[in-house]
Amino acid sequence: MSISTVELERRLHSISPRWTKPATPLPSILIHGFVFIAWIILLGNAFLGRGVFAWSVGIVYILYDTALLLFTFVQTWPLQHVTQHPAATGRRPTVTAIITAYNEAPVLAATIDALVQQSEPPDQILIADDGSTDATSLVLEAYCKLPPPALGEMAESGTKLRWLRMPHAGKARTLNAALTHVETELFITVDADTILLPDAISAMRDAFSTDPNLAAATGVLTPVCGDTTSGRVLEWFQSYEYVRNFLSRYAWMRVNGLLLISGAFAGFRLDAVLTVGGFDPNCLVEDYEMIHRLRRYGYDRDLGWHTSVLGGALGNTAAPSTITRFLKQRRRWFGGFLQTQNWYRDMVGAGRYGDVGIWMLPVKAADTMQPIYGLSAFILLLWYIVTGRIELLIPVGGLIIGKIVIDLTFHAWSIFLYRKWVGGQTKVNFGLAILAAIVEPFSFQLFRHLGASWGWFAFLTKRQGW
């Protein structure tokens, strides 16, 4: 399907609720309002309540997180019986891998190498250079053995490589420009700092070839940080965070509610993405917003489109190595999440959107306030310690210890399941997972909530510069 970026933008404007602005139905207003008003009431109870119930905001926070763990536990139960990821038979769909790069010269060659060396390489590799000012052009000249194309033009080597050179306009616009040159049935987005394992593309092909209604799929990623003290600590915490998060995605996939697809390594059916207008340049998390648009369009037209997470499609992706970069990343992620939840608020609680509307998006409505609940609970706990409120600290401490025990149990079980799911291709182990479960509530989790709260500030002030 040949298409221009102008036509993509026209389709985006005609489909996205950011422009169509549907009315917000009463269920959505009630769900979002309940989450916010409940926080106000629970926080007020800290000054009016007695005994352990003065810490009601913390109790609700613990109960909500435990409920999500229980949901994931139940839905991921079948993973204990996974033995392998069977290869599909029959015709294989054609695939273009799109690498978007902005000043990624040090890592770009390794990313391309990993694609070229796949057990089943993509039919085309399209490097979309978003106006890099570093040595990216030199790297690509050496790799493609071609002079740099003019801005807005594409150079093609005699191999599978294509080089699209664009003026700097952001990842989403560069991706949309690349889509106009894709000639295959599928395209896969790969960040320039993401290294795919050898069978990753094959696993993507398997999934799409066996399921004609699969519109998008995410691979399973492992975070890799720099070799510094802060990098090693953050990699430890983020590794187990990623394990839990990808298992959670599997759980939501099981109830047809998966919305979170990692653009660092994701596969899409080209016709579906072009139909809904490509990626939105005005969203901070263009991959996440895209999935909402795909699911909405599919439900509205009874197309049966759905999404998946693939345990056989594995990759390693660069993750923040310093607290500052980590907080900025989480600020962008959460700010973009709030943008998307706001734009698609008419789907919240709407039965016509199936489990996405009835379950997933109401949970996401609660998630908008989860970091605020968490930080409120922690600040109150500090206040009890400073003021010597022993009568509160003892029962609250018991609740926290009980939650840690639950987390320990879930962490151990999740490592067992995750290893089965990815075929043993992981370095995570039980000992470090248990240690992370003990330390995380008083360290890494607080930084996650701080970054998310910063995202709230950015969302409310409509900041787009990151």
Model-inferred region functions:
Residues 3-110:
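N-proximal low-complexity "stem/linker" segments adjacent to membrane-targeting elements
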Residues 42-79, 87-89, 364-460:
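Membrane-embedded multi-pass helical conduit in multi-pass membrane proteins
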Residues 93-96, 124, 274, 289:
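Cell-envelope/extracellular polymer assembly enzymes that use nucleotide-activated donors
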Residues 113-167:
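Acidic donor-binding segment of Leloir-type glycosyltransferases
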Residues 149-163, 167, 172-180, 184, ...:
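Long helical/loop segments within the catalytic core of UDP-sugar-dependent glycosyltransferases
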Residues 187:
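Short aromatic/hydrophobic "clamp" motif used to bind/position activated sugar donors
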Residues 272-275, 283-309:
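A short, conserved alpha-helix in the catalytic core of glycosyltransferases
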Residues 305-325:
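Active-site donor/metal-binding and catalytic loop motifs
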